[in-house]
């Protein structure tokens, strides 16, 4: 396969938390790109997977050959020699690109780093199917809500002081030690910061290790407080959030370890957060583009009927306590493109991927990209146009997915002013 540009077929997952029927961007993209997909209006459509992960592998649109097999036939040409050497694979992309459409809260979860991922995979391959880490970046394509990382410690201390059932669940002694012992403004890596993290770990550990009966009884009090005394909470959005998530997962530990302990993050379309390995998070509602290191490892904490690995979770977390604003991605102009519209770079502090958003903002014309030193996957999320490299010119509509080989110069040509694409890529340097 010598083509530098070709269309891919992407598979989808129908997890229970996905948006239902044609309200789901995943369903819309799947049906628009594949006429054989008939949307079932009573079924959830949760994730569209784009990449080489064996669970849902992407395939060449015309030949139906798996992308991983095409790469294996020409690793240097399809990945670039630098990426083959760096990521030690001759058939797989180092990233997994997704669209998520979220109706119900996902499990509060964290992902292991590389060392822990390898150890967990050896010890428990059923629950940890990969040996890799899984840092993630989420870019909102509609209004989005999620939990991202632990709240700043002073907010958590105020919550403990205001909410008796939270204090009781944590334990009065541990709660008092936390409120008296935290040092606000501690420099990262300092002894004060290390002490802060240990105090936070004690609070989280006590919540996560409480019995189901104890959690349920405390959750009933918390829900009643949210109904009857919303002013008791230090954030006016919390009571409604607690009531909403309690309807989805009644009396769940997530009401404490999520609603009370994690940042409630709200993003508008185009805004983005980066979620490091070993930081707790959960998506609540909305449609997002997600990119991650190629792994499917999850350590769950709450809002889930699935396996919860409390011991590993409590031990593995970083216990960082940054604000939402500190976790939002800084959007950068992309210097290696030109023409109509613009391209914004989302560049997280990891090696496996970066993402470009190209939007024509009501204009028409062509946007040109210089060749990149690695492979890319592109999805059209809105509007229509064409994608071209050399003599290959392909129609691009919402849900259409493409592979671009290293060093291929590419033009996006808009047919309407809403034409928007996202492009995940990796370069060795």
Swiss-Prot record:
Main location: cytoplasm
Molecular function, one GO term: mannose-6-phosphate isomerase activity
Pathway(s) per entry: Nucleotide-sugar biosynthesis; GDP-alpha-D-mannose biosynthesis; alpha-D-mannose 1-phosphate from D-fructose 6-phosphate: step 1/2
Subcellular compartments: Cytoplasm
Gene Ontology CC: one annotated term: cytosol
InterPro entries found in the cross-reference section: Man6P_Isoase-1, Mannose-6-P_Isomerase, Pmannose_isomerase-type1_CS, PMI_typeI_C, PMI_typeI_cat, PMI_typeI_hel, RmlC-like_jellyroll, RmlC_Cupin_sf
Coiled coil: none
Catalytic reaction list: D-mannose 6-phosphate = D-fructose 6-phosphate
Cofactor: Zn(2+)
Active-site residues, Swiss-Prot/TrEMBL: 300
Binding residues for Zn(2+): 109, 111, 136, 281
Cofactor note (record): Binds 1 zinc ion per subunit.
Keywords, alphabetical: Cytoplasm, Isomerase, Metal-binding, Zinc
UniProt xrefs under SUPFAM superfamilies: RmlC-like cupins
Record carries keyword Transcription: no
UniProt-listed GO biological process terms: carbohydrate metabolic process; cell wall mannoprotein biosynthetic process; GDP-mannose biosynthetic process; protein glycosylation
This enzyme's EC code(s): 5.3.1.8
Role played: Involved in the synthesis of the GDP-mannose and dolichol-phosphate-mannose required for a number of critical mannosyl transfer reactions.
Similarity comment: family membership: Belongs to the mannose-6-phosphate isomerase type 1 family.
Protein name from the UniProt record: Mannose-6-phosphate isomerase
Species per Swiss-Prot/TrEMBL record: Eremothecium gossypii (strain ATCC 10895 / CBS 109.51 / FGSC 9923 / NRRL Y-1056)
Lineage of source species: Eukaryota, Fungi, Dikarya, Ascomycota, Saccharomycotina
């Amino acid at each position: 396969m010598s083509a530098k540009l070709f269309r891919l077929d992407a598979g989808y997952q129908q997890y229970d938390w996905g948006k239902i029927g044609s309200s789901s961007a995943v369903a819309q993209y799947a049906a628009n790109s594949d006429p054989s997909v008939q949307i079932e209006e009573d079924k959830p459509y949760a994730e569209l997977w784009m990449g080489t992960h064996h669970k849902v592998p992407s395939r060449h649109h015309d030949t139906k050959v798996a992308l991983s097999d095409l790469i294996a036939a020409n690793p240097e040409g399809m990945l670039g020699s630098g990426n083959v050497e760096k990521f030690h694979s001759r058939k797989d992309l180092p990233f997994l690109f997704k669209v998520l459409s979220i109706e119900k809260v996902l499990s509060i979860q964290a992902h292991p780093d590389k060392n822990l991922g390898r150890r967990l995979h050896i010890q428990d391959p059923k629950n940890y199917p990969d040996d890799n880490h899984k840092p993630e970046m989420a870019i909102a394509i509609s209004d989005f809500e999620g939990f991202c990382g632990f709240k700043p410690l002073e907010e958590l201390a105020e919550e403990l002081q205001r909410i008796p059932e939270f204090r009781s669940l944590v334990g009065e002694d541990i709660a008092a030690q936390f409120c008296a012992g935290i040092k606000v403004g501690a420099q990262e890596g300092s002894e004060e910061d290390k002490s802060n993290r240990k105090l936070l770990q004690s609070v989280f550990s006590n919540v996560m290790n409480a019995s189901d009966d104890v959690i349920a009884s405390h959750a009933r009090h918390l829900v009643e407080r949210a109904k009857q005394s919303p002013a008791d909470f230090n954030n006016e959005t919390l009571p409604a959030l607690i009531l909403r998530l309690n309807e989805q997962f009644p009396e769940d530990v997530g009401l404490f370890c999520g609603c009370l302990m994690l940042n409630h993050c709200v993003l508008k379309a185009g805004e983005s957060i980066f979620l490091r390995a070993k930081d707790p998070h959960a998506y609540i509602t909305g449609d997002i583009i997600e990119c991650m290191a190629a792994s499917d490892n999850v350590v769950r904490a709450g809002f889930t009927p699935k396996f919860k690995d409390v011991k590993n979770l409590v031990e593995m977390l970083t216990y960082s306590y940054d604000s939402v604003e500190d976790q939002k991605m800084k959007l950068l102009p992309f210097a290696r493109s030109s023409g109509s519209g613009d391209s914004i770079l989302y560049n997280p502090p990891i090696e496996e991927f970066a993402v470009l958003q190209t939007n024509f903002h009501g204009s028409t014309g062509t946007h040109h990209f210089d060749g990149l030193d690695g492979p890319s996957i592109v999805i059209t999320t809105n509007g229509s146009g064409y994608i071209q490299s050399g003599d290959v010119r392909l129609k691009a509509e919402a849900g259409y997915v493409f592979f671009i080989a290293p060093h291929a110069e590419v033009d996006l040509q808009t047919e309407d002013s809403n034409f928007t694409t996202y492009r995940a890529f990796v370069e060795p340097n």
